[in-house]
């Protein structure tokens, strides 16, 4: 709330979730898991935060795992209920990094190698589940996109500006118009942002399509 008095009109929270690094048996939670679920606790925190900030006309946004959009197991484990959090947050920022999806999610052999299809599928799922809310309850969606390579993913190719731009186009094609880029080294490719029209350059489209086909063929032949 103090940030509002310093001139900020939106506060974005990250890590509003339970840990994925330790087992529940290794943690002493100060609540009865038999009467309260992780999702209930996180949702209540989001509601409380949004109400506090809303009282001072501050927009409240929250980062969430991209997989919680339509994966009930992940949602339950980290406590992020995409729809319920969306009822209170002004904006949700799902981290729909293609590298963070397992093989065959959205029927993609290696989602990392299909940046357009992976992001489009995730955000179409976002549209579908959030449409269960009334128009007044529905949050804005501003997705996090991948501007980095993922060498830890088996069979993953090195990301190029075309891969980044393909994800941006997927945002527009899914019906959204806001996005964020992430790279832990804080190095972003300006060439990936060269189109100001929201249209993907035909040369980049061809690059991405050729690469996706080549990567799919390579995976199939390895099998």
Question: Where are these predicted regions, by residue range?
Answer:
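Substrate-binding cleft of secreted/luminal carbohydrate-active enzymes
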Residues: 8, 89-100, 115-217, 222
């Amino acid at each position: 709330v103090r940030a509002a008095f310093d001139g900020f009109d939106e506060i974005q929270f990250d890590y509003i979730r339970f840990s994925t690094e330790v087992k529940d048996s290794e943690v002493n939670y100060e609540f009865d898991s038999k009467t309260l679920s992780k999702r209930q606790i996180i949702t209540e925190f989001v509601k409380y935060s949004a109400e506090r900030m809303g009282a001072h006309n501050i927009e409240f946004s929250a980062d969430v795992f991209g997989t919680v959009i339509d994966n009930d197991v992940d949602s339950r484990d980290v406590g992020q209920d995409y729809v319920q959090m969306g009822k209170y947050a002004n904006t949700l920022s799902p981290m729909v990094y293609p590298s963070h999806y397992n093989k065959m999610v959205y029927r993609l052999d290696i989602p990392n190698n299909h940046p357009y299809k992976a992001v489009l599928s995730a955000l179409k799922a976002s549209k579908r589940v959030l449409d269960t809310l009334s128009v007044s309850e529905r949050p804005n969606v501003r997705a996090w996109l991948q501007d980095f390579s993922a060498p830890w993913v088996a069979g993953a190719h090195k990301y190029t500006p075309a891969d980044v731009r393909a994800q941006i186009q997927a945002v527009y094609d899914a019906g959204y118009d806001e996005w964020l880029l992430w790279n832990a080294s804080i190095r972003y490719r300006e060439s990936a942002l060269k189109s100001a029209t929201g249209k993907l350059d035909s040369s980049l489209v061809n690059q991405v399509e050729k690469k996706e086909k080549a990567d799919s063929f390579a995976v199939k032949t390895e099998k």
